[in-house]
Amino acid sequence: MAYTGQTIHNPVSGERIEFLRTAADTDGELLEFELELAADGRVPGAHVHPEQEERFHVLEGTMTFRLGLRKIVATAGESVVVPAGRMHKFANGGAETARVRVEVVPALDMEELLCTTAELAHEGKVMRSGMPKPVHLALFVRRFRREVRAPFPPAPVVQALLAPLAALARARGHAARYSATPAMA
């Protein structure tokens, strides 16, 4: 579990995250963190948070968001809200590091998801795109199914297809989650 003031870094995506308020701080109501995204930083691809709303408040720099087919460019002082269930992705839209305050409502296990992605990146268990390698993706998708899913194919199809690979990964000693002390910045 993450703690307030903890900072993690994902060297593949270019994300540096400082947890401001965790699920424990807010009784699960929200997770709040400050995201610094390097000039070439981006999330691995389009995704959906089935049960969570994400609120992005740009503090410095420029961010580019895709919400469905809609492109939004947000600069310092602007906010973008992604409703639960909405396909989206984001990237730094400028030449300088962007700084964004992010709120995720409700928190669920999003902080654990973020810590896990950082650890996977540090351990070389992700592809160049930032997506976990298949064996780790199978575990990740099953573990964090309330927090994130691919926009297509339908979630039940993905779960069914990855179940055998997840079982194999567990049999080989791989974990779906990582320690409470993830890659520090």
Regions from the PLM with identified roles:
Residues 1-30, 41-52, 57, 62-185:
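Jelly-roll (double-stranded beta-helix
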